[in-house]
Design a protein with these regions (language model features):
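Short boundary/linker motifs that mark transitions into or out of structured domains
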Residues: 1-43, 95-105, 150
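Short amphipathic alpha-helical recognition elements used for nucleic-acid or partner binding
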Residues: 31-64, 84
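Intrinsically disordered, charged and Pro/Gly-enriched terminal/linker segments
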Residues: 32-33, 49, 69-73, 93, ...
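DNA-recognition element of transcription regulators
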Residues: 36-45, 70-91
Length: 181
């Protein structure tokens, strides 16, 4: 059986999702504070949070244009992805962070993502290990709480697809606060 090699990560972008949406790479940053469409940020967040797999066009359309009477949601998606790529160009230059592949889009596996949500979740999991000393656990909880800058993607909190994730991270936050008390 032939194994496919893991792609080599060329660059790693730091992504903040807790308390706001920001990307930082090589000292250049981009955040949702700039005046852009919320759908643009939402589609970008969806791609990053689902970076482990190609996302079919149909999934994007069901998620972002469910009852939209748009005459051509496929074209609307392509236009939006073009705008996202243009917005990301100052960060990535020639490296394309978003790839198209057989009716789907995916986050380029050569672009690593360091997400605050992943670090937050990992710290909470480590802190819940009862085999650790109380002091070590409290240090881990403090580190986790310092990462939690607010709810997940607060400007996009009306998005149905985000609600379960937001509830999960907020629940972890409340558990960490309670454990620290």
């Amino acid at each position: 059986m032939k194994r496919t090699a893991e792609p080599t990560v060329i660059k790693t972008v730091s992504v903040s999702l807790l308390g706001g949406f920001a990307l930082e790479l090589d000292g250049v940053s981009l955040s949702d504070d700039i005046n852009r469409s919320l759908k643009l940020w939402s589609v970008l967040a969806y791609l990053i949070l689902h970076r482990d797999r190609p996302v079919p066009q149909s999934e994007f359309i069901e998620t972002f244009w469910p009852d939209d009477n748009s005459s051509n949601p496929v074209n609307a998606l392509k236009t939006l992805l073009y705008r996202i790529r243009s917005m990301l160009e100052p960060l990535f230059g020639e490296l394309q962070p978003i790839l198209a592949q057989r009716g789907a889009y995916l986050w380029n596996p050569a672009v690593g993502c360091d997400l605050d949500t992943d670090r937050f979740e990992a710290l909470c999991a480590q802190a819940s290990d009862e085999s650790l000393s109380s002091e070590s656990r409290m240090d881990l909880y403090r580190s986790a709480l310092s990462l939690y800058q607010g709810d997940l993607l607060p400007k996009l909190d009306h998005q149905m697809w985000l609600i379960p994730l937001s509830v999960r991270y907020h629940g972890l936050y409340l558990s960490a606060v309670k454990a620290q008390a």
